[in-house]
Regions:
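Short helix-coil boundary/hinge micro-motifs
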Residues: 1-146, 150-157, 191-192
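Short linker/helix segments within small regulatory modules
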Residues: 158-165
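Basic DNA-binding region of bZIP-type proteins
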Residues: 171-189
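Juxtamembrane/interface motifs at transmembrane-helix termini
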Residues: 107-108, 166, 184-187
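Short alpha-helix boundary/capping motifs
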Residues: 100, 116, 160, 175-176, ...
C-alpha cells in the first residue's frame, strides 16, 4: 500500500495520540495519562513536530485535544468503514478543514488540512482525520486496529502486506505472548 509521506506522519501521530490515553490494567488500576497536563501537551507537540502551534497552549487546548483523542479512539473501535467515515467526517468538519499546499521547515510539498491559525486540537483533527480518511477511501479501514494482547489494547495501523499484524510494537506484545505460549507448552510436555 503506497501511503504519501505526510499521511504516514499523520497516521503515526494519531496512533501516538490515541495511545497517550490511560489504560486499565488487569488489577483495575489505571495507568497515567500521557497527556495529563499542558506540559505533556507541549512535549507531544514537540515530539511530533506539529507546525503552526504557538507557545501559548493552555488548559482549554488540553481539554480540546483530549476530546479529539477520544473521538480518534472511537475510529479505531469502529466496526465498519461507514461508522469510521461518519466519525471522521464529524471530526474534520468541526475542525474547519481548509486544505492548502505547503513546504516548510525542510519538508517537501505536502498538504495541511487545518486552517491557518487553527488550534492544536483542530490541527490534529484536520490532518490526522484526513489521514484516517485516506485509509477508509483506500478500502483499508480494517488496518486501523487495537493490539490483541490481553493486557495492552494500544492502537496501531497494520501496514503489513497481508494485513496480518495482531500486536503493537510499543511493548513487543507479540513476543511476550509467543514466549508465554512456548513456556506453557514446554511445561505441559514436561508434566505429561
Amino acid at each position: 500500500m503506497l501511503i504519501p509521506h505526510d499521511t504516514r506522519i499523520a497516521l503515526d501521530t494519531v496512533v501516538d495520540l490515541v495511545n497517550t490515553a490511560p489504560e486499565e490494567d488487569s488489577g483495575g488500576v489505571g495507568s497515567t495519562d500521557g497527556l495529563g497536563d499542558v506540559e505533556a501537551l507541549y512535549a507531544f507537540v514537540r515530539t511530533h513536530d506539529i507546525s503552526g502551534v504557538g507557545n501559548d497552549l493552555g488548559n482549554r487546548d488540553l481539554r480540546a485535544v483530549l476530546n479529539v483523542r477520544a473521538r480518534f479512539a472511537e475510529v479505531f473501535e469502529a466496526p465498519d468503514a461507514r461508522s469510521a467515515a461518519d466519525l471522521i467526517n464529524q471530526l474534520v468538519a468541526a475542525a474547519g478543514t481548509t486544505p492548502q499546499l505547503t513546504d516548510h521547515d525542510g519538508y517537501d510539498w505536502h498538504v495541511h488540512y487545518f486552517a491557518p491559525g487553527a488550534s492544536v486540537a483542530d490541527h490534529l483533527a484536520a490532518d490526522c482525520g484526513m489521514a484516517l480518511a485516506f485509509m477508509v477511501v483506500a478500502g483499508e479501514q480494517e488496518r486501523l486496529r487495537r493490539c490483541e494482547a490481553p493486557d495492552c489494547g494500544h492502537a496501531f495501523v497494520d501496514l503489513s502486506r497481508n494485513r496480518s499484524r495482531r500486536y503493537c510494537d510499543s511493548r513487543t506484545c507479540g513476543n511476550r505472548l509467543h514466549v508465554a505460549a512456548y513456556r506453557a507448552r514446554r511445561k505441559e510436555a514436561a508434566a505429561g
